[in-house]
Design a protein with these regions (language model features):
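Catalytic, metal-anchored helix/loop core of enzyme active sites in primary metabolism
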Residues: 1-178
Length: 178
């Protein structure tokens, strides 16, 4: 939908994936690296201690990665087109431009700080994306509001469930006012 389109364009979606990877796989933030892959053929890669790499490849379509995630460890028959390596002549990778796409850098900052900071960035992002879709904020202005919320909402190192609920509410109020 519209929100995921904006999150992808601003690279906040990648930022959320970095935060998710830390929790899903129990890795340190410095073990998670984002690379831009313009062909969108490689959906994920893991490099192991011995330097070998396992990658999940497919057409630029999220049906296969989602099917794989839901059916693992089983493999289901795919009813959609398959990747043909004969037509896949080039795979390129680039470093993300975190100066231009500040949301990815903000997500890494939230991950490094921990505590309730990922909650703050999530709540602020939901508000600014809605504001952008309703023509109340510019595309680049979204990052400014998220960053201000990260600076102004009280940081809690070891939040309780109640702290998360309060943080979410306060951040949404603040983001709407900025």
């Amino acid at each position: 939908g519209a929100k995921i389109t904006i999150d992808s364009a601003s690279m906040m979606n990648k930022g959320f994936e970095v935060i998710e990877a830390k929790w899903l796989f129990g890795v340190r933030p410095d073990q998670i690296e984002v690379v831009v892959h313009p062909q969108s053929i490689i959906h994920s890669m893991v490099q192991f201690e011995d330097s070998s790499i396992k990658a999940q490849l497919g057409l630029p379509d999220m049906r296969l990665p989602i099917q794989y995630a839901f059916s693992y460890p089983d493999r289901l028959h795919a009813s959609f087109p398959r990747l043909d390596f004969k037509t896949c002549t080039q795979l390129t990778f680039e470093q993300p431009d975190t100066k231009r796409f500040r949301n990815l850098a903000l997500a890494y900052e939230a991950l490094h700080q921990g505590g309730n900071m990922p909650c703050i960035i999530n709540a602020a992002n939901e508000v600014v994306v809605s504001a952008f879709l309703n023509d109340r904020i510019s595309f680049l202005g979204m990052s400014d509001v998220i960053e201000k919320c990260m600076q102004q909402v009280s940081f809690i190192e070891k939040p309780t469930y109640e702290d998360y609920v309060a943080t979410d509410k306060l951040t949404r109020i603040m983001a709407n006012e900025l």
